[in-house]
């Protein structure tokens, strides 16, 4: 497997991992804002991007093995949403490779259960899975709307997310179903105390997809985490605030 990775800039290596249904185009503005200080690797997760059909993964372990093999041996990792969950699992498995974490709108568990209330209700998630099976384009638009909802610049965020989808192409084959299985099954709560890398947890106060409380939980459970709430921001907090997010990342890096 060979990942598609968009690389720009000079400096310490920093990988960007997007969330479900998106592609690496969504990182363009943030990548440009970071490129003066980092060598940025915007990763197309398997099944996404222009050549989506050529790259596949069928388990979280296989995905982490591919990331570990194809990206630099020492790097910072920034993950958004599902990408943040993958980043945490990668950091847990490969602590010598992943030096720092930046977690944007992420969570240890996406779906609520009996002892986790900071996620999407199981019934709502099951309904979304059915929507994806019935019409992926319609389901993706619904998902984009959830990502933009609550943001003070929701209309602009939704427009930019849709432009990213249009330019980057649709996910191929089993990629949407694989991503949904990860969202359903990943539960990192027991792993968080063993993730010892410095971590910057950033969360939009108005996130309509992953509750702000999930970000607060992450920051409290990760041993070396800092928490940054972004007022007026929704789930896609970096899309129209790339300069502010990039500055927070640089400041965090300077402290660690």
Report residues per predicted region.
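Conserved HGGG/HGGXW glycine-rich cap/lid loop of the alpha/beta-hydrolase fold
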Residues: 2-53, 60
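Gly/Ala-rich beta-loop-alpha elbow adjacent to hydrolase catalytic centers
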Residues: 79-83, 87
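Conserved alpha/beta-hydrolase "acid-adjacent" motif
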Residues: 208-214
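Catalytic histidine-centered segment of alpha/beta-hydrolase-like enzymes
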Residues: 233-246
């Amino acid at each position: 497997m060979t990942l598609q990775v968009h690389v720009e800039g000079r400096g310490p290596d920093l990988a960007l991992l997007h969330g479900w249904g998106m592609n690496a185009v969504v990182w363009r503005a943030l990548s440009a804002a970071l490129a003066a200080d980092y060598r940025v690797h915007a990763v197309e997760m398997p099944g996404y991007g222009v050549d989506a059909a050529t790259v596949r993964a069928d388990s979280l372990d296989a995905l982490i093995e591919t990331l570990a093999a194809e990206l630099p041996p020492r790097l910072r990792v920034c993950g958004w949403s599902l990408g943040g969950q993958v980043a945490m699992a990668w950091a847990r498995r490969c602590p010598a490779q992943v030096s720092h974490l930046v977690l944007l709108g992420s969570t240890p568990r996406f779906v609520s259960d009996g002892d986790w209330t900071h996620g999407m209700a199981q019934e709502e998630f099951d309904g979304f899975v059915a929507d994806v099976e019935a019409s992926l384009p319609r389901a993706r638009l619904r998902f984009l709307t959830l990502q933009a909802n609550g943001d003070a610049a929701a209309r602009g965020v939704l427009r930019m997310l849709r432009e990213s989808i249009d330019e980057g192409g649709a996910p191929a084959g089993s990629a949407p179903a694989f991503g949904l299985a990860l969202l359903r099954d990943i539960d990192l709560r027991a792993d968080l105390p063993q993730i010892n890398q410095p971590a910057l947890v950033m969360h939009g106060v108005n996130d309509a997809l992953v509750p702000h409380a999930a970000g607060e939980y992450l920051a409290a459970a990760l041993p070396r985490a800092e928490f940054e709430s972004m007022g007026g921001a929704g789930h896609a907090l970096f899309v129209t605030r790339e300069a502010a997010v990039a500055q927070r990342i640089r400041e965090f890096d300077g402290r660690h």
